[in-house]
Amino acid sequence: MNDTNDVMHVHSESISPKKNDLDIELGESVVEPHLSNNSIAKLDTYELEENEDISDYAYKLAGISNEHPAHPQNWGWWKKAYIVLLSTSLQMYVFWTPNFYPGVQDSVMELWHLSSQVSLLGQSMFVLGVALGPLFLGPLSDLLGRKLVYIGSLIIYVCFCISCALARNYAQLVISMLIMGVVGSTALGNVAGAVADVLGDEDSNWGMYMFIFMCSVASVGSPMGTGVAENPKLTWRWLYWIDVIVGGFFIILFVFTPETLPAIVIQRYEQKRQGLPVSWFPQFSLKKLAKDTYFVFFMAIKIFFSEPIVSSLGIYNGFVNGLLYFFLQAIWPVYFSIYKMSDMAASCTYMAAMPACVILLWFEPLQCWLYKRDKRKHQNRLRPEARFIMTLFYVWGFPIGIFMFAFCSKVHIHYIVSLIGLTIFNIADYHIWQAMLLYVTDAYPNVSASAVAAFELPSNLGAVGFIHLSALMFSRMNVHWATAVVGFASLPLIALIYALYFYGDRIRARSKLASQRVPINTAAH
């Protein structure tokens, strides 16, 4: 998720990068962007010394000021709202595909005579692709811009949706799902970057909320998969034809959507202002793309093994993210087998994520107020630990919701009780994900692209593991104790949030990459 390095726009003291490195190579005519003290992405001296030959990527956004009149953060509110809504809606579209896969699973098991574990490969390979895609699609979006990556990845995504719809064997379906996951990962990295392009520091919470909310709306894929797959006039293949139709609609919208990458927007503005030819198709080389991709990957691996904050949060988020797919499997033995609901009614219970995010919306202003108050208390200095103020309370909803679902899913207890437990779990789950992502970008502003990549890789790999582990657990344990086991496993993880809130500043003080104190330019607010 390379592009999420812009999720939190951090004002920091400028360094003095080389002029040649600051040139934005987007066309034949290179115009130096408007510079100021407020760098969007500043590379740490430590990093430059050790990676002098691969630092092009880190310099990409250096010196671009949000005070420039052409900067996307200075656009009209309606234009920014449209871009945020469209970009985050893409996340809903891409992620309803792994959510509708349970509707496909039974059909492909019967069609190609597969075991239950093998039949899950389509879903798990999609999630694996989402984990791997940002490692090279992220740097590509910083070279070509958000718009071209959106359109290009969507075209490939739609092509392989057609491949899934016409699959002649299971291998074709699995390989196509893997490629769909890789190119569909733009719904994580590119979307987060585009949202950060148009929203400043003070508004980032709301942008991340929309990012998380559209993830919850993707849960509509569960009943959609059941309804379409069970319709004899449609069958499971029509789920992928629906993806093709909706994907074509998104392609058309993005063709008429403006570019948001500040480097390109400012470049074109300066070219127009000076009467120079405007470069609408950025130039780049495969060598430069390879260098930038290598930089993100190299630093991501280095950060994961050398920074305990990132590695611990990444593993925690792998558990958190994996439980979403765990409960996608758990709803069937509970609501179909215990409560005797129809397939459609049982699949609709997975949409408990949507009211959970609506509830989060009501408390988002409180989190923003607490965050601003914390900055005032610390002399207007951004403190990453302030992202966890509300999390200290939300984190307890994680085991509470899991245990409610585990031990209240019984015939003599109304199903609404277990649904409330599932909703409480989702409230905690989505809030923790949002808080951890913002914490990582705040704590590692100089290498945030690689830090987020290091954070997200184990997160999605955890989801891959839980897809297969959950099926194994439910085949060998009853649903009550299978769910209780993950509930007990979540208890020690509560300590991690408290440890980072109270001792995170001391841990960051020992890091060469983490930021201890990030000054805020109050004049900009």
Swiss-Prot record:
Which biological processes are named by the entry's GO terms? export across plasma membrane; pyridoxal transmembrane transport; pyridoxamine transmembrane transport; pyridoxine transmembrane transport; transmembrane transport; xenobiotic transport
Q: Which organism is it from?
A: Schizosaccharomyces pombe (strain 972 / ATCC 24843)
Q: Where in the cell is it found?
A: Membrane
Pfam families to which the protein is assigned, alphabetical: MFS_1
Q: Does the keyword Transcription apply?
A: no
Any single Gene Ontology cellular-component annotation: plasma membrane
Spell out which residues are annotated as carrying Phosphoserine.
Answer: S55
Entry membrane topology? Multi-pass membrane protein
The UniProt keywords, alphabetically, are: Membrane, Phosphoprotein, Transmembrane, Transmembrane helix, Transport
Give any GO molecular function from the UniProt entry. Answer: pyridoxal transmembrane transporter activity
Name of the protein described by the UniProt record:
Uncharacterized transporter C576.17c
InterPro entries, alphabetized:
MFS, MFS_dom, MFS_trans_sf, Sugar_transporter_CS
The family this protein is said to belong to: Belongs to the major facilitator superfamily. CAR1 family.
Q: Quick check: keyword Transport in the entry? A: yes
Indicate the transmembrane segments per the record. Answer: 81-101, 120-140, 147-167, 173-193, 208-228, 238-258, 295-315, 318-338, 350-370, 388-408, 413-433, 454-474, 484-504
